[in-house]
Amino acid sequence: MTYTYDLTLGLPHTNHRFFAEQLMLKFAGHFQWQSIAAAAGLPLSSLRTADGSEVYASFYYIDTVIPAAAPLESFRLDDTVRFAIDLRAFKNIAFEGRVRFDRPERLNDATSPSIRFANIFITPEQGNSRLRVAPPAQADFHDLPPLPNEENPYHITRAASESGALGVLDEAWLQERTSTVTYAIDVDRDTNGAGLVYFANYVAFMDTAERRAVPKGRERSLRHRRIAYYGNAAVDDTLAIDVAVFRSGAHPDMLGFRYTIRRQEDGAIICLSEAVKALA
């Protein structure tokens, strides 16, 4: 079954870059959660573990592809964007969402942007810094197509935790420079209703570090990004965002980026990402 949602863009959905990446992910992620809830037949906020603890469908992997024919900044105020989501479930605890979005009349076009989401149910064990995998006791997702273990994005995130790379940048991309930016989490702006640092805001953190690393010049437009999430952070913590800038002779009008986000509390890596952006 395909879950379909329409969003008409207004001021709350846009910024100076129009349908910017972190805003797009907020709404696409919300539709992913709504789809999981529809499959469960229950609001996700009502799900509990066997011992009564709250559970949350946390994102652990995102792969976003934005074709040049439909850049995010081409979606403007009052445009309607349709999201179509197909889910697969892994052992009642993890989910893959294959998402396509575009203007309704173009959604079936092969040039539509796409996202691959992966979620897993977790519960905070000792605040945001200690999250435990926690299957809900009262939900059954057997009606969803199964996600084979070998296709579970978990394997991608585990490999990236060892190599530091996510496969967006190959050996043709040569590192040009690096930069580190610190960011104090803003409890009012950066958290969600579950009390966690919101997954989409990690992109805003990375964009902030990227702007510091690259001198002001041509605008950059996302073409491909992968994100692996490994944890969260206390709402009063500070993050260190490392960004490395890459160039490729084969892609002179593009820049590559590799990001690492660490929390100050214990120095743990909570996110890795790689992206390729076109220079406008």
Predicted segments, located by residue:
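Hydrophobic, proline/glycine-rich low-complexity stretches
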Residues: 1-84, 90, 206-210, 214-219, ...
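Sequence-level detector for tyrosine residue identity
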Residues: 3-5, 56, 60-61, 141, ...
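Generic preference for flexible, low-structure residues
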Residues: 40, 44, 97-103, 131-133, ...
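Acidic/His-leaning functional-site neighborhoods
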Residues: 169-179, 184-242, 246-258, 269
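Non-catalytic linker/capping segments at the edges of enzyme domains
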Residues: 1-30, 93, 112-113, 118-194, ...
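A generic structural micro-environment signature
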Residues: 15-17, 24-25, 30, 61, ...
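HotDog/MaoC-like acyl-thioester-processing domains
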Residues: 70-160, 233-235, 246-280
